[in-house]
Amino acid sequence: MAKSLIFAHRGANKEAAENTRSAFDKALQYPIDGIETDVQLSRDEIAVLWHDRYLGKAGLPTKHIDDYDYSALQSMNFAAHFSASANPEGIVSLKEFLAAYRKRCHLLIEIKNRDWESASRHQIKVRHTLDLVGAPQGDAIMASSFNLDSLIYAQRYRPGFPLVYNFETDQTYADAQRALAEQSFLHGLCLPIASLNETTVKLLRDHGKSIAVYTCNSDAEINNALELGVDILISDVPQKALQIRAMKTGAA
């Protein structure tokens, strides 16, 4: 069986501000297999890396990322919330991220959709992401979303691109059965670690699908994911996950 791949969640987010170049570069100081990040759109429809609903970490707790054009986001400091001594860092665009990291490790790009956005804006985000990535090259770069409609649209727009359906904590085994039966194009599911069990693993393996899990930080969570043989283990502490994997397999 192939070993589980360790992905840094928004970079090394315990060592630098998440989704910044510093976080990605620090993550790559470890022998990680991949990086997970999040894509949203600026007001002028530039794909940028940002997870949260609001810009509280940039000192703007009532504002969204799409309240600002890309140029304004570049001038903001997205590192100050992590440490007052951190060097200022503006927003990272998806284009910059791909140019810097696509040849260095696997990438899992989560396309974030928000309730206040129109369906057309969701689709713009999908198109921009897939256009910037280009033709799929196996599972070197994958896209994911909690929004199944966005993944269905992505499959129509770029057939064959590896698309992963992210599950919420309240979704069930029956939801997984339904998704796999109705959406056979899915590359796999990304499950909350609390939802991972042998029954769900067997379901996904029987369908020939990939299994990713988030967010595995404790020893128990990491061990559970590794023992069940997930394909992708997403962690805020990738160095710990690497150490535990090495102890289990004899190699990092």
Question: At which residue positions do the language-model features occur?
Answer:
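Phosphate-group recognition and catalysis centered on beta-loop-alpha active-site segments
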Residues: 1-252
